[in-house]
């Protein structure tokens, strides 16, 4: 591989991981980014290019960071020159290291991270070494060096380029699908196909489990419902949101493909697991008003799911940057669970138009949204931040948005 010249587009966390991996293999790495600062601070690249410069000659293949669109000019230039384009997922799956031991992967529109982290916790609590990686936070090219079962969260961005078969996964799961990232994929069909591409990564096609009958694979709903009934019988368990219960049962089903983990171990893991923040995170109550941080709800379907668990007196804070979806499909859930909506940010007016049949107040930002919600609230009400939008109009991430909400509520200091 020493003579290969490889372009890496985007030098954020994943891009730097890609560049480091390739440099360690003796590859000549050509780095591309819109930021000169990012180029200057990546020590793994031999040639530096701003993205408005011309595509170089003598390139063997291109690796794009997951967030880099297929419409990026350098990606299009590579395609026009018949140069292979891939993401870190395909790069990892090509390595011999990925066939050495058990590897599981999960994708879907909602619930991926909670399911992945619970699966990792379930394994470790059962004495089975495991490591979560991929879209969950640790880039796959870094995480695959760790011992134990590999548990990979894969996004549609990472599967969009999947054309070849890389049969490395001993188990896989597509949790669900609904409109998301249509601004990136262009349409639902492209988004759906990206998710279905997980099938190309299975060692045995029979070990791909799916939560929607439109996908190719084993429909797992009956199995998951069996485990949900098991949890329902456990009166000692703390109350669980329906979607959390569903995610835990999906993880257990996937774990049992390779490992005989007992139902008792599963129940004990559910009882002791702390799910990640910003996912229907109950912050407490002030003057009888309850607060929930669901900043991770960046899609309409995620907010619909959230509304199933907030009773019928919710004031819902929506808004941010739209990901190509319409908000009118929220109306049935809002009518059951909410008394009003506060719309904020870049697409606030669009939300107000889509929900014109429902009480909506338009504000500029999160601070104003919380003040407005508190003015409307009475004891017993629930104020829930469940935006149904990306955060990038006013924040760097959904985590930053959620941390700011917690700070504004007065439940936690925020470090930005």
UniProtKB/Swiss-Prot annotation:
<protein>
    <recommendedName>
        <fullName>UDP-N-acetylmuramoylalanine--D-glutamate ligase</fullName>
        <ecNumber>6.3.2.9</ecNumber>
    </recommendedName>
</protein>
<dbReference type="InterPro" id="IPR036565">
    <property type="entry name" value="Mur-like_cat_sf"/>
</dbReference>
<dbReference type="GO" id="GO:0008360">
    <property type="term" value="P:regulation of cell shape"/>
</dbReference>
<dbReference type="InterPro" id="IPR004101">
    <property type="entry name" value="Mur_ligase_C"/>
</dbReference>
<dbReference type="Pfam" id="PF08245">
    <property type="entry name" value="Mur_ligase_M"/>
</dbReference>
<dbReference type="GO" id="GO:0009252">
    <property type="term" value="P:peptidoglycan biosynthetic process"/>
</dbReference>
<dbReference type="GO" id="GO:0051301">
    <property type="term" value="P:cell division"/>
</dbReference>
<dbReference type="GO" id="GO:0008764">
    <property type="term" value="F:UDP-N-acetylmuramoylalanine-D-glutamate ligase activity"/>
</dbReference>
<keyword id="KW-0133">Cell shape</keyword>
<dbReference type="GO" id="GO:0071555">
    <property type="term" value="P:cell wall organization"/>
</dbReference>
<dbReference type="InterPro" id="IPR013221">
    <property type="entry name" value="Mur_ligase_cen"/>
</dbReference>
<keyword id="KW-0131">Cell cycle</keyword>
<keyword id="KW-0963">Cytoplasm</keyword>
<keyword id="KW-0573">Peptidoglycan synthesis</keyword>
<feature type="binding site">
    <location>
        <begin position="108"/>
        <end position="114"/>
    </location>
    <ligand>
        <name>ATP</name>
    </ligand>
</feature>
<dbReference type="GO" id="GO:0005737">
    <property type="term" value="C:cytoplasm"/>
</dbReference>
<comment type="function">
    <text>Cell wall formation. Catalyzes the addition of glutamate to the nucleotide precursor UDP-N-acetylmuramoyl-L-alanine (UMA).</text>
</comment>
<dbReference type="Pfam" id="PF02875">
    <property type="entry name" value="Mur_ligase_C"/>
</dbReference>
<keyword id="KW-0132">Cell division</keyword>
<comment type="similarity">
    <text>Belongs to the MurCDEF family.</text>
</comment>
<keyword id="KW-0436">Ligase</keyword>
<keyword id="KW-0067">ATP-binding</keyword>
<dbReference type="InterPro" id="IPR005762">
    <property type="entry name" value="MurD"/>
</dbReference>
<dbReference type="GO" id="GO:0005524">
    <property type="term" value="F:ATP binding"/>
</dbReference>
<dbReference type="InterPro" id="IPR036615">
    <property type="entry name" value="Mur_ligase_C_dom_sf"/>
</dbReference>
<keyword id="KW-0961">Cell wall biogenesis/degradation</keyword>
<dbReference type="Pfam" id="PF21799">
    <property type="entry name" value="MurD-like_N"/>
</dbReference>
<comment type="pathway">
    <text>Cell wall biogenesis; peptidoglycan biosynthesis.</text>
</comment>
<keyword id="KW-0547">Nucleotide-binding</keyword>
